[in-house]
Amino acid sequence: MQVSVETTQGLERRLTITVPAATVDAAVRKELNGLAKTRRIDGFRPGKAPVAIIKKMFGAMAHARVADEMMQNNFIKAIIENKLSPAGAPTMDPKEIQEGQDFEFTATFEVYPEFEVAGLETIKVEKPVATVKDEDLANMIDTLRKQHATWADVDAAAADGMRVTMDFIGSIDGEEFDGGKAEGFNLVLGAGRMIPGFEDAIMGKKAGDEFTIEVTFPADYHAENLKGKAAKFASKLIKVEEQILPELTEEFVKRFGIESGNVEELKAEVRKNMERELAQALKNSVKEQVLNGLVEANQIDLPKAAVAQEIDTLRQQALQRFGGFQGGNAPELPAELFQAQAERRVRVGLLLGDVIRTNEIKADDARVTSIIESMATAYEDPKEVIEYYQKNEQMLNGVRNLAVEDQAIDLILSKAQVTEKEVAFDEVINKSGAAA
């Protein structure tokens, strides 16, 4: 076998592989003999038909099979001998097999880039420092109360935080428009659901009041026909309600799985959940900064095949997330939606992979155990979850991969320029939610 390697462009390589005629002819004869033994030919006993007839009837089939086998086997040998790492499946272009002649084919594919991660000392990380304070806990308890709040009619002017029920008809230049009419519409004032100025016009009104709301749709409004248009809404306020928060009673506490109904137990459980969420958010913040710095310090070419594969993965995840379409009903989401995210994933994967290989990072058993225990605390029976992971090798391997990634992040962090900054609980959590 002879192999020549050509760099066509960027990461693309073209192998021209030549297989000696003797090897090809022997493979064709073997294939024809096998076909002769298994195929029925009229007038001849199995395996007794003349070679000329076998070639005439099965020659094309034998050549096709031999070509496939030669391309697969010799391509693998060629990339091993030339130390190439394909980033995707090759495009094969074979010449026709001719008796007594060498068989030649080309294989075109992309390789992974060759690089060494550098510039770790230039990465800057602002490490947020935060704790769950008593006021944070109180706010979270209030949030739980609001989630279980009820509404009661009041004979009062509508104000921030109140809920109103109203009818309205919208018009532009005296003409009603689609989507501008509603009856029995519920709106919590101050929630920011409506376009600017709409809620402000309701403030101070009482049930039974009829009035006109005059607003202008934003220039970036989602409906093209309404962008920047001035509109009037003929409105009537049907009902004004105020929010009634439940007291921290035994009954209320039991709604959250605290069988004793003890308020302090609820607070302790909520604080524990908040601390777990905060720890994860702090970790994510640091990790995101480390990866951003790693990418900025190391500009590398990306194999198009690897990016395309990542786009397909993201597309399938999106379809599952938004309804799990069956069969041919799935919409073809454009690749552009996922291009940037796919490129980042591939780039980060290559860079982290180099850090892991160069530093020979292996999963630390203590780190693996810590990750499993941390995940288990989110479940009702942590011990059962831990045992499940310990008995499931596939799940364990997934955790080991997480541990290796964490250890790589820690190594980069140890070389980076790190400063600390005290931040509030809400700020950390809100940033984490926005990033997700």
UniProtKB/Swiss-Prot annotation:
<dbReference type="Pfam" id="PF00254">
    <property type="entry name" value="FKBP_C"/>
</dbReference>
<dbReference type="GO" id="GO:0003755">
    <property type="term" value="F:peptidyl-prolyl cis-trans isomerase activity"/>
</dbReference>
<dbReference type="GO" id="GO:0044183">
    <property type="term" value="F:protein folding chaperone"/>
</dbReference>
<keyword id="KW-0413">Isomerase</keyword>
<keyword id="KW-0131">Cell cycle</keyword>
<dbReference type="InterPro" id="IPR027304">
    <property type="entry name" value="Trigger_fact/SurA_dom_sf"/>
</dbReference>
<dbReference type="Pfam" id="PF05697">
    <property type="entry name" value="Trigger_N"/>
</dbReference>
<dbReference type="InterPro" id="IPR008881">
    <property type="entry name" value="Trigger_fac_ribosome-bd_bac"/>
</dbReference>
<comment type="function">
    <text>Involved in protein export. Acts as a chaperone by maintaining the newly synthesized protein in an open conformation. Functions as a peptidyl-prolyl cis-trans isomerase.</text>
</comment>
<dbReference type="InterPro" id="IPR001179">
    <property type="entry name" value="PPIase_FKBP_dom"/>
</dbReference>
<dbReference type="InterPro" id="IPR037041">
    <property type="entry name" value="Trigger_fac_C_sf"/>
</dbReference>
<dbReference type="InterPro" id="IPR008880">
    <property type="entry name" value="Trigger_fac_C"/>
</dbReference>
<dbReference type="GO" id="GO:0061077">
    <property type="term" value="P:chaperone-mediated protein folding"/>
</dbReference>
<dbReference type="GO" id="GO:0051301">
    <property type="term" value="P:cell division"/>
</dbReference>
<dbReference type="GO" id="GO:0015031">
    <property type="term" value="P:protein transport"/>
</dbReference>
<protein>
    <recommendedName>
        <fullName>Trigger factor</fullName>
        <ecNumber>5.2.1.8</ecNumber>
    </recommendedName>
</protein>
<keyword id="KW-0143">Chaperone</keyword>
<dbReference type="InterPro" id="IPR046357">
    <property type="entry name" value="PPIase_dom_sf"/>
</dbReference>
<comment type="similarity">
    <text>Belongs to the FKBP-type PPIase family. Tig subfamily.</text>
</comment>
<feature type="domain" description="PPIase FKBP-type">
    <location>
        <begin position="161"/>
        <end position="246"/>
    </location>
</feature>
<dbReference type="GO" id="GO:0043022">
    <property type="term" value="F:ribosome binding"/>
</dbReference>
<dbReference type="InterPro" id="IPR005215">
    <property type="entry name" value="Trig_fac"/>
</dbReference>
<dbReference type="GO" id="GO:0051083">
    <property type="term" value="P:'de novo' cotranslational protein folding"/>
</dbReference>
<dbReference type="GO" id="GO:0043335">
    <property type="term" value="P:protein unfolding"/>
</dbReference>
<keyword id="KW-0132">Cell division</keyword>
<keyword id="KW-0697">Rotamase</keyword>
<dbReference type="GO" id="GO:0005737">
    <property type="term" value="C:cytoplasm"/>
</dbReference>
<dbReference type="Pfam" id="PF05698">
    <property type="entry name" value="Trigger_C"/>
</dbReference>
<keyword id="KW-0963">Cytoplasm</keyword>
<dbReference type="InterPro" id="IPR036611">
    <property type="entry name" value="Trigger_fac_ribosome-bd_sf"/>
</dbReference>
